[in-house]
């Protein structure tokens, strides 16, 4: 049987699990997983609070998938610039897009664009060391407000309540 070549754009959990399922389902499948970042794992790496070691354990499972011979991770590749869909179609039998969420949802709140107002994605990316975010953050405010009651809002509130050395 002929080998099936598949490209996955996006090396977060969805892209890596897609590669895993495809190679298990189709014996002759080979998958290249591309990401614009130098390291894989997407929001599991760059979007989970550092004090969530159990969730970060998911990286171990994803690493096992990427270590298989039939799956290859290729980082620092920008879709649309370094690779285009016509190029991918010439070399692959199928292309899967799993590019994930890059930004916050726009909030219709007065003052949201004032200096000192930051979205969760930027702050979480900063404390997780995302390569697209500056290494410094203005931690000078005496009072902050965290809008939301979901997991990310709670993570941010917890991180802000910790001493800086933690």
Protein language model features and the residues they cover:
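N-terminal Rossmann-like dinucleotide/flavin-binding domain of flavoprotein oxidoreductases
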Residues: 38-94
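Short amphipathic alpha-helical segments
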Residues: 20-21, 45, 107-111, 157-159
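Conserved beta-strand segments of alpha/beta enzyme cores
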Residues: 30, 70-72, 116
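Rossmann-like nucleotide/phosphate-binding core characteristic of flavoprotein oxidoreductases
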Residues: 1-9, 21-32, 47-51, 83-86, ...
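FAD-binding core/adjacent interface of flavoenzyme oxidoreductases
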Residues: 2, 75-143
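Glycine-rich FAD pyrophosphate-binding loop
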Residues: 26-42, 166
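Rossmann-like dinucleotide/flavin-binding elements
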Residues: 3, 9-26, 124-166
């Amino acid at each position: 049987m002929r080998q099936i070549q598949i490209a996955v754009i996006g090396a977060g959990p969805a892209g890596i699990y897609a590669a895993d399922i495809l190679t298990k389902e189709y014996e002759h499948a080979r998958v290249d997983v591309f990401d614009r970042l130098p390291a894989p794992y997407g929001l599991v790496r760059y979007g989970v609070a550092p004090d969530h070691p159990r969730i970060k354990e998911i990286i171990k499972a994803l690493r096992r998938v990427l270590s298989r011979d039939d799956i290859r991770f290729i980082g620092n590749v920008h879709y649309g610039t370094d690779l285009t869909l016509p190029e991918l179609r010439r070399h692959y039998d199928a292309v899967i897009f799993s590019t994930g969420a890059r930004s916050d949802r726009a909030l219709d709140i007065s003052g949201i664009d004032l200096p000192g107002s930051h979205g969760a994605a930027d702050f979480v990316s900063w404390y997780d060391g995302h390569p697209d975010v500056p290494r410094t953050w203005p931690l000078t405010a005496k009072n902050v407000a965290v809008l939301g009651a979901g997991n990310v809002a709670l993570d941010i509130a917890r991180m802000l309540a910790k001493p800086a050395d933690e």
